[in-house]
Amino acid sequence: MLRKLFGLTPKPPTLPWEDRSKLSTITDEAGPSSALLVRDVEDADFEELVVRSDRLVVVDFWAEWCQPCTIMSAYTEWLVRDYGEQLLVVALDVDENPVTPAAYDIMGLPTLLFMHGGVEVDRQVGLLTYEELQAKVTTLLASAA
């Protein structure tokens, strides 16, 4: 939506880990059978996948034109690799899905929303280091247990 308003053109072709148009798959050393996913979520299925989840959920609000979002995308994939089934990581394209960002007052990108039991428990606006993100997730998982 913002891309259309401001006449922004899509960025050049992306590297495989930057392509957020599909489910993003990462694989650890054990091979393809242990593939883990960062799931793309839309306005229509946000409540079912995120709000009703019994796990800690990390929601990555991103946009194609947002360069820092590319870095955050890699971090969310690393979270899946490092924490596995302990949490659910989803990504929502704010240009294609404007209802959910408006409902949660998402004003800047990238934004990570941390939810547990349908309630927002934390929020990160802007970049941070992966180590800072790990510390935040570890603390939230401990308090959710």
Q: What positions do the PLM features span?
A:
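Short pre-active-site segment immediately N-terminal to redox-active cysteine/selenocysteine motifs
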Residues: 54-57, 62-65, 108
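Non-catalytic, surface beta->alpha helical segment in thiol-disulfide oxidoreductase systems
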Residues: 108, 113-145
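Typically the conserved alpha-helix immediately C-terminal to a functionally engaged Cys/Sec
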Residues: 68-83
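N-terminal targeting signals for export/organelle localization
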Residues: 1-36, 145
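A short beta-strand-turn-helix
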Residues: 38-57
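Structural microenvironment flanking redox-active thiols in thiol-disulfide oxidoreductases
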Residues: 87, 92-103
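Conserved Rossmann-like nucleotide-binding pocket used by diverse enzymes
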Residues: 37, 62, 88-90
